[in-house]
Every structure is written in C-alpha cells, then in structure tokens.
Regions:
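N-terminal glycine-rich FAD/FM-binding segment characteristic of electron-transfer flavoproteins
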Residues: 1-323
Length: 323
C-alpha cells in the first residue's frame, strides 16, 4: 500500500504547485504510515526530478510513452490508474487545477474510488478517513468521509504550502501499456506566453472590476502589479465587456487562484467572484461603497475612489523600493 502523488510538469519543469503536492503527499504518507510514491509523466530530466526530493519524495516513477506526449484526459487517467493499481495505492493525490479536475473523476471511476475534491488540509482523521474542503462557493467548509478502499484527493492550490524534507530520491523509469486509440487530442499549434507571470502562479495579484470605470484607467493598476512582482486579474463583467483579456478573469466561472496577497480594486465582491479568490492568504479591498460585500472577505480595506487611491499606492511602493 502507498500514497501516490501525480506531479504535473510544464515543458519538462516543475512549479510550486508540484512541490506543494509532494509536501502534502509526504505529510499524508507519514500520517498513514505508508510509503510515498511520486509519479511524473513526460520527458523530464533527472536533475529536475531530483528537485522533488527536497520536499519528501524518496521514490519517483518517471513514465514516458509516445501516447502520453500530448496531454489527454482519458490517456493520462488510464496511465495513472495502471500505476496506482501496480503500486497498490491507498490514496492518489492530484492538484485541483484544470488538469486534476479533468483526470480525477475519470480516475475515480477506473479505480472505484471515492473522491475528495478541493481539499485544503491533511485529513482530520484517517480511520475514518475524513478530509476538509471548502463548499458552497467558498462560503462554508465541509468534512467529507471517504469510505472506499482506494481514495482520490485533489489539493486546492496554495492551500498547504511547501514543507522541506530534503533527501535523495531514487528515480525509476517505467512504462505502462496505453492504447493510442484513447488519445483524442491533437495539437494544431502551440503558442508560448513569454515575459508575463501566469495568474495561477502569482503570489501577488492585483485585480480590477467595474469600479475602474473604463478600460483606459488600468495603467496604475498594471503598474502596481508590476512593482509588487505580481499579476493582473479582473472580474467577469470586465472581461465580458472586453476591457481585459478573458485569461485574467477570476471567479467561479474563471480561474481559481490562491495568492498570498489579493488586491481587489473596484470589485463589489459577488459570491461568484469570491468563490475564485477566497483561498487567498490576505485580501485587500478598495471600493467606494463601504457596504460592498468584498469588505467582509477582506482583511484590510480602503474606502475610496480607485482613481485616487491607486496612484498613491504606486508612489508609496516606489518610495519603499527606492529606500
């Protein structure tokens, strides 16, 4: 029996998300008294795989197959299911990002396993096996008991943090038979984004809503994000109006993020928006309406016009950086 963690890579490199998964898996394996097995799919160099050892990985399985060169939900779910069966995995851990959300339900069916989605902490108990997760668009918390022999967990991003447990992992190259007919995905064209921090990777996010009043007013917001080393985001109405690209839309129907600092500018704080940002460590709200719902979710608030507040924040950050 083992705890199996699937770590996604991006063009052969791991990100914080991957290290957080390994940290969580190591903690879970310790609770259960089971070995931790980390699975990587695709062409990843040994030097990159060894980085997982810093967070508790001691045994890494590197799976590479022509049928798995392009991500496909069905093919990846089949491959992970085969590895889980071979390793007699009691718990399989994935990220709750788009990839994990696509794979986990399929994996659940293949393994006849109960699924705890969007978990944010280690289990409250292991017998019974009870996990802790947000529910009702982030407005409540739920304790979910998973009763099946095999269990699947998807971990909410930036919810557990990185726990260093350095060691030298063993790396095993392996293969599993994956039917090429399962692969329904083809890549017609690949465009890489360069020079811009990905929203889901950012530890600081500055987000704007309709309170920005016009697409022409985003200069100070973008400048503040750049000064802080963060990313920009927006509410759904803003992206629907075409003020900002849809890739910046956060909320229940957009990207789910959990940065260390989320600055909401001119955003009222509708339930749908808060569902996508409520896992942020610290929320700062700037709004002219002192009764806006966003202030109830925020740790800090400024009641004022964004057009007046943002330039002052920009100047304050510049002064601090120049000291």
């Amino acid at each position: 029996m083992a705890v199996l963690v699937y770590t996604e890579n991006w063009d052969g490199s791991f990100k914080k998300l991957s290290f957080e998964l390994v940290s969580y898996g190591a903690g879970l394996a310790s609770m259960l008294g089971k070995p931790l097995v980390v699975l990587s799919i695709g062409n990843v160099a040994s030097s990159e795989l060894e980085k997982l050892g810093k967070y508790g990985a001691r045994r890494i399985l590197s799976l590479s197959d022509p049928a798995l060169q392009v991500f496909d939900n069905q093919a990846y779910a089949e491959a992970i299911a085969q590895v889980a069966t071979r390793e007699q995995a009691e718990v399989v851990v994935l990220s709750n990002n788009n990839t994990g959300k696509a794979i986990a339900p399929r994996l659940s069916v293949k393994l006849k396993a109960g699924l705890g989605a969007g978990v944010s902490k280690l289990p409250l108990s292991t017998n019974p096996f009870v996990v802790y997760k947000r529910s009702f668009s982030g407005n409540a918390f739920a304790h979910v008991e998973i009763k099946t022999p095999v269990k699947i967990i998807t971990l909410a991003q930036n919810s557990f943090g990185l726990v260093e447990n350095p060691g030298t992992p063993s790396i095993e190259t392996m293969s599993v038979p994956v039917d090429p007919a399962l692969v329904k995905t083809t890549v017609a064209e690949a465009q890489k984004q360069t020079g811009k921090l990905l929203l889901t990777d950012a530890e600081i996010v500055v987000s704007g809503g309709r309170g920005m009043k016009s697409p022409d007013n985003w200069g100070p917001l973008v400048e503040l994000a750049e000064l802080l080393g963060g990313a920009t985001a927006c509410s759904r109405p803003v992206s629907d109006e075409g003020w900002r690209p849809h890739e910046e839309h956060t909320g229940q129907t957009g990207k789910i993020i959990a940065p260390n600092l989320y600055i909401a500018v001119g955003i009222s704080g509708a339930t749908q928006h808060l569902a996508g940002v409520s896992s942020s460590k610290v929320i700062v709200a700037i709004n002219t309406d002192k009764d806006a719902p966003i202030f109830e979710a925020a740790q800090y608030g400024i009641v004022g016009d964004a057009m007046k507040v943002l330039p002052k924040l920009v100047e304050a950050v510049k002064e601090i950086k120049h000291k």
